[in-house]
């Protein structure tokens, strides 16, 4: 793993679960809010995104909605986001994600409860589920307050189950999706996990909207592009 990645991961690891204890050198733990206003990843109640694409050669539809609920994870108030993944027209995966924002504007990922479903709607797997403060899992950085090219972070800290990482590769990327074209306005990141060393994905974010596109770069065949967005 490159030095930049190690630095980013070490920084996140040092923070730990802010609701429980302060990091070394900090006067107090970070203050978190369920009101997520980071311009590249806003999560306000009522927001809704719909994506269309392909997964392993099959039609994909992904619907993401910010609920009006707030849940406390390790004492931290978190926004609750519902993510439903449809493949070939049927619900294949349903996930609840928890996010909170610190006072500087960085968005933290506090976990997820995911369910994979068979054609009859029965749960076949919950692998990848985790919650900060439970079984040694800790929150990670999902979107920094001021992303800079070269920054790397760990989004998840649940060894053996959830270990996503990402790096900022461009702040002026161009991206075109059914919802619109954004010339030189997109933040581009690349994601990977040591649990799947042969897989690498790219994501594009636009200020005021959030994620507009995701595509597998290697190790798979998945693409999702924003087709509609409701602010609230």
Tell where the protein language model's regions lie, with residue ranges.
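Secretory targeting and sorting signals
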Residues: 2-25
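Conserved functional acidic sites
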Residues: 26-232
């Amino acid at each position: 793993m490159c030095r930049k990645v190690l630095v980013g991961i070490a920084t996140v690891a040092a923070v730990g679960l802010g609701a429980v204890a302060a990091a070394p050198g900090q006067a107090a733990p970070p203050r978190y809010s369920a009101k997520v206003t980071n311009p590249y990843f806003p999560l306000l109640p009522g927001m809704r995104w719909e994506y269309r694409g392909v997964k392993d050669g099959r039609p994909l539809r992904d619907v993401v909605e910010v609920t009006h609920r707030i849940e406390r994870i390790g004492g931290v108030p978190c926004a609750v986001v519902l993510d439903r993944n449809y493949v070939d027209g049927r619900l294949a995966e349903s996930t609840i994600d928890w996010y909170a924002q610190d006072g500087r504007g960085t968005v933290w990922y506090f976990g997820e409860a995911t369910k994979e479903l068979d054609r009859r709607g029965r749960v076949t797997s919950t692998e990848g589920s985790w919650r900060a403060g439970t079984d040694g899992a800790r929150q990670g950085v999902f979107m920094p307050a001021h992303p800079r090219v070269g920054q790397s972070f760990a989004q998840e800290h649940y060894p053996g189950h959830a270990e996503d990482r990402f790096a900022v590769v461009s702040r002026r990327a161009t991206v075109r999706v059914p919802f619109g074209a954004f010339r030189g306005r997109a933040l581009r990141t690349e994601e990977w996990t040591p649990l799947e060393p042969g897989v690498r994905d790219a994501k594009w974010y636009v200020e005021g909207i959030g994620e507009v596109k995701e595509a597998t770069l290697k190790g798979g065949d998945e693409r999702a592009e924003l087709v509609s967005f409701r602010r609230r």
